[in-house]
Amino acid sequence: MDAYEKIYQLYHLIKTKTAADLPGPYKVGVDLGTADVVLVVTDESGNPVAGSMRWASVVKDGLVVDFRGAMVIVEKLKAEVEAIMGITLDKGATAIPPGTVGRNALACGHVIAGAGLEPVCQVDEPVAAAKALDISHGIVVDIGGGTTGIAVLKNGELVFTADEPTGGTHVSLVLAGAYKIPFEEAEILKRDPARHRKIMPVILPVIEKMATVVKNMLAGYDEFNEYPVYVVGGTAYLQGFETEFGKAFGRKVHVPPHPLLVTPLGIAMFG
Ligand code: ATP
C-alpha cells in the first residue's frame, strides 16, 4: 500500500468503525490535538488496522490544558478500538509540536499512561506526518487547530523544525467575528465544504498569514527552495486552500487526502 492508499484506508476504517484483517504485532499512536484526539493502530509495516477520533478541546496551542478530560477521551478511544479489534492495546506513541519543552512535553505521555497505554515514543508532529507520507526529502507543513509546525527532511534526516501558534482556531475566530456568531458555530460553518467557497474571501487573510509564517520560518534556508512542500492538518481540508496557500507562499504545495489523518497515522508508525 502506498502512502495515500494508507490514508484512504485509515479514513474508511474510522468511518465504518471496522478493523483491517492484518496480523500483529500492532503499533498504536495517539494524536492529542487542539481540535480533536485521534487514536490509530497500524501493523508492523504501517498499514492501518483500526482507528477512532473525537472532537475535543483538551489541548491549547499544542499544550495539554485539560489533563483529566484528555485522559478520559483517550480511554474511550482505546476501549472503542479494542472492541473493534477484539484485543487489548497496552502501549503507544504520542507527538508534540516542535519546540515543546519541559513538563509540557511530558504531559502527552502522562495522558496516555493514565489511559492505560505505556508511552513508548514521543515525536514531533510534522516528523510523524513525513513518516506517514513516506517522504525522505521535502518540507512538511502541519497546520492543526492551534499550531503550524514544519519539518524539513534531507536524505531521510530531519534537518530543521519550527513551530508557531497559528492554526485553524484562528480561521474560526475570524469567521466568528465576521459573521457575529459564537466560536463553536464558526467551527461547524468552517467544516462544511458546501460553505467553503463563500467563506474563502473572509478567511483568505488568515491563510495568507499562515503562508507568511512558514515563509519566514524558512527564510535564509535557500537550499530548501527546490524541496517539495506538503501541507497536512485539518485546516488543509478547506477547498481552495492548496491554491491560495501556494500563491501566498510563492511555491506549489501538495495537500494529501484526508490531511487531518496524516499526522495521527505517522504517530502510530512510531508506536
Ligand atoms: P494541533 O496539532 O495544532 O494541536 P490538531 O491536532 O487538533 O491541532 P488537526 O486535527 O490537524 O489539528 O486539525 C484541526 C483543525 O482543522 C481545526 O481547526 C478544525 O476546525 C480544522 N478542520 C477540521 N476539519 C475541517 C474541515 N473539513 N474544513 C476545514 N477545517 C477543518
Tell where the protein language model's regions lie, with residue ranges.
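Nucleotide/phosphate-binding catalytic cleft detector across ATP-hydrolyzing
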Residues: 1-34, 38-143, 157-271
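Short glycine-rich anion-binding loops that position phosphate/pyrophosphate groups of nucleotides
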Residues: 146
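A structural feature that tracks compact, well-ordered secondary-structure segments
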Residues: 149-151
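A cytosolic small-molecule/anion-sensing beta-strand core signal
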Residues: 154
